[in-house]
Amino acid sequence: MTISALELISYYTKFLSMLSQDEINKKLEEWPKHYDPKGIELKWQNIWMTKEFWEKVFRFRDEDEKSPVFVIDTPPPFTSGELHMGHAYWVTISDTIGRFKRLEGYNVLLPQGWDTQGLPTELKVQYKLKVPKENRELFLKKCIEWTEDMIKSMRTAMIRLGYRAEWERFEYRTYESKYRRIIQKSLIDMHKMGLVEMREGPVYWCPKCETALAQSEVGYKEEDGVLAYILFPFVDGEGGVTIATTRPELLGATQAVAVNPDDERYKSLVGRKVKIPLFDKEISIIADKAVEMTFGTGAVMISTYGDPQDIRWQLTYRLPVYEVVDDKGKIKNTNGLLDGLTVKEARKKIIEILKEKGYLIKVEKITHNVLAHTERSDCLSPIEFLIKKQIYIKVLEWRNKLLEDYKKMKFTPQRMSYYLEEWIKNLEWDWNISRQRVYGTPLPFWYCDNGHLIPAPEEVLPIDPSKVNPPVEKCPHCGLDLKPVKDVADVWVDSSVTVLYLTGFYDDKSRFTKTFPSSLRLQGTDIIRTWLFYTYYRTLALAGNIPFKEVLINGQVLGPDGTRMSKSKGNVVSPLDKVDEYGADAIRLTLLDAKIGDDFPFKWDTVKSKKLLLQKLWNAGRLSYPFIGKKKINKPSKLHEIDKWILQEHKKFVQQSIEAYRNYDFYIVVESIYSYFWETIADEYLELIKHRLFMEDESAIYTLSRIIKDLLILLYPIAPHITEEMYERLYGDKMSIALENLPDTSDLEDDGEAQKLGEYIKKATSAIRTLKIQNRLAIPTPISVKIYGPDDFIAKIKIIEEDLKKTLKLIDIIYQENNEIKVELLSDHGS
């Protein structure tokens, strides 16, 4: 074999241009060998919070008339002080979307609010700080102090996870004057529309919290109970009707006995009179289709009120109302029989008395669903139905409009729209917004005894009616005296105006025009019937349009055992437990490695594997640094065949990742990084080009620089800390990777031959590595091999034969055509 003079000159030139090992080692010393997530993350979190970065990267630009706008209506968490894994999940989603949309060229508004008011804080101040509610001013002062302490703790935790909201201008608290003004203005506007009124009637009442509730705040929970069979004697003769009830303590409030008209057992009894045992009161037997013939005896007592069905029957048949339960859940108005006892105590005692008097037929122990205050996990107490004068927002008359317009919002996953639709369809009551608490937004009205509401003048908002005189002395409707409404608003009244607040509906028409409807609502499944529904309804009523174009509903983060996290189970995991050990980026990768809308278990072993992925990325950056670090690299006139192949793989990765981000399929991005970076770049491509990097081959250096940069940009939204650090070290073209554009692969035409070469490379390298392992040879051991395969396979492998030899330490390769691809070890492999 002869070598031409031209080839010798070319080889000598390349030899002279090779980096020496000393030069490479010196460069490598500039790049730490071990990935230090804590150090890197704290560094960048501090940098991101600087004024310069806020202004150039994270600020929503009001003056920008060219860029498309993306507004994220993020959840304002209740200020408990503890950032749990559910918070960490949506914080990661919000931040990831915000960072991606900036790369995509959007002017992003990423706010963060705090749901500050409500019962849990009151209970902390009342019982932990020992501040009495009666001292209203001091109590409210301590509530706010407690709230601010909790916000500080939660904000610090959010920032530690890499969350960069626009704290400078779009952090809000629902107790603040500027936010309260909007809450109160929205209520006054709805009053003008005839949608807010005071009325008296049965309400959901929580005796533990001593406040009225809305339908959305209650639900059923399973409890042990009793089913008491009680004899109601006939008034006009012997015998009687035996009813079955789970609420015998409400016997004194019974207004009728009901049976099903189709029940043959009772058809002849409809209309007859019976006596209420122990209370010597006569009531009638009535017939109603709602009575379940298979429940108990098929005969039930109608009390005021044991459950929602009792309310329906009382209204339908205009039955009298008699209350036997007070605000604290204690029995009253039973002529001393049960007065002063709790509901459970009264239930036990009346069963004993009925048995003693001969009215108790039998008692069964049962497990049944009880209506409870389920919206607050720290309560979960059974609720009662009490007669109260409350303020309501009319909802039911909007049902048809709500069922139509929700379809204008795009849901991810689409199946989540079903839950909103079903909630709207099954609404039974208007929204009771009165709460008998202290720490909340004052309802901006005065009222008279006839129930007329007089709103506060808008120019004095926010206002506490209990502290100032009404705008008029007498009710303009009836002339009666006016009294301040002392109740505060349901906290969902507060949070249902987040979109109106952020988009400037009341105070910034320019921003409102630009940002409404907002781009995205992000939230969990558990608040579809509260935050989502109330925001949707109130925005539709007040602004005449849907509040957001898209709704993203995330699933629930479960404990490592796959069940709901619970302190009693001991499976609660805090995101901050090991954030310093594994890093926020690894936690974020773990949280986003599940399909949006699905529940998934959180395991630290998974986080550990994500850290290994980031260590692998860090190693790749370190390997690349001596060859591409901060260098001006131009595209060569001709690309090596291996580089052509990897750019085809790269094109698929880039396009797939961008599409996945746009569809909120973050798990696809995470999976793609594993399959593309780890399995293809790190395990195959980098090994194949090392020898060319040492020769400073233009094609290898250009290709490596391009794919690493694009990879960092596409990983940045999910893992922003390590990508900022590596970008700064390797490129630093801009002050932040956030200011880069999304990768563009439009210059890469589809190349089927290059893709086929890549498949053949993987098969050949895998077969040769397997051969060495089977023969107990170390990978660096030089060997000679015989490669079998079809014509096309052999032809393409010959193109990159020298690369295979250098990468896999092959002395010689002999080829033989064969239908099957396989590799044999030649006997003189070590010679």
UniProtKB/Swiss-Prot annotation:
One of its GO terms (molecular function) is ATP binding. GO terms for cellular component: cytosol. Transmembrane segments: none annotated. Its main location: cytoplasm. It is an enzyme of class 6 (ligase). Its EC number is 6.1.1.9. GO terms for biological process: valyl-tRNA aminoacylation. ATP binds at K567. Catalyzes the attachment of valine to tRNA(Val). As ValRS can inadvertently accommodate and process structurally similar amino acids such as threonine, to avoid such errors, it has a 'posttransfer' editing activity that hydrolyzes mischarged Thr-tRNA(Val) in a tRNA-dependent manner. This is Valine--tRNA ligase. It comes from Sulfolobus acidocaldarius (strain ATCC 33909 / DSM 639 / JCM 8929 / NBRC 15157 / NCIMB 11770). The gene is valS.
